[in-house]
Curated annotation (Swiss-Prot):
The keyword rRNA-binding applies. The keyword Cell division does not apply. InterPro entries: Ribosomal_uS7, Ribosomal_uS7_bac/org-type, Ribosomal_uS7_CS, Ribosomal_uS7_dom, Ribosomal_uS7_dom_sf. GO terms for biological process: ribosomal small subunit assembly; translation. It comes from the Bacteria. One of the primary rRNA binding proteins, it binds directly to 16S rRNA where it nucleates assembly of the head domain of the 30S subunit. Is located at the subunit interface close to the decoding center, probably blocks exit of the E-site tRNA. Keywords: Ribonucleoprotein, Ribosomal protein, RNA-binding, rRNA-binding, tRNA-binding. Pfam families: Ribosomal_S7 (PF00177). Belongs to the universal ribosomal protein uS7 family. This is Small ribosomal subunit protein uS7. PANTHER family: RIBOSOMAL PROTEIN S7. One of its GO terms (cellular component) is ribosome.
């Protein structure tokens, strides 16, 4: 905890093509080693693929996909008298968004055998349709929270 008061979150400027902060955050999650232009090509290429396949606005598809993947609950370890309990807590909106984007990108990277823009597009479409690796990760987290519901009173 900082002694100089609360830390204010940085303002992320929207991306130039879709004028969306969400797309900019996705670009930042895809980026490796500071190579932003490559990350932009991947994300914009994926958005073009989504537009071709769904005939819908890719931004609304992405927003719905992220909304589907965003977890509501997570478990945090809490030490009580020598035992460590996994305590379920609600996920704040900023952390939920961050986790959703991270899981979508990770699931896209785990797919093999095609270019990254195609993998990312397919993962976003899967998340849009409530299937895929990122949705599996969210369901796994919700199952953990459900299994440890008995420890919910240890919340802090």
């Amino acid at each position: 905890m900082p002694r100089r008061g609360p830390v204010t979150p940085r303002e992320i400027p929207p991306d130039p093509v879709y004028n969306s902060v969400l797309v900019q955050k996705l670009i930042n999650k895809v980026m490796l080693d500071g190579k932003k232009s490559i990350a932009e090509k991947i994300v914009y290429g994926a958005m073009d693929i989504i537009r071709e396949k769904t005939k819908q606005d890719p931004l609304t598809v992405l927003e719905k996909a992220v909304q589907n993947v965003t977890p509501l609950l997570e478990v945090r370890p809490r030490r009580v008298g020598g035992a460590t309990y996994q305590v379920p807590i609600e996920v704040p909106p900023r952390r939920g968004l961050s986790l959703a984007l991270r899981w979508i990108v990770r699931a896209a990277r785990e797919r093999k055998g095609m270019p990254m823009k195609e993998r990312l597009a397919l993962e976003i479409l899967d998340a849009f349709n409530n299937t895929g690796g990122a949705i599996k990760k969210r369901d796994e987290m919700h199952r953990m929270a459900e299994a440890n519901k008995a420890f919910a009173h240890y919340r802090w």
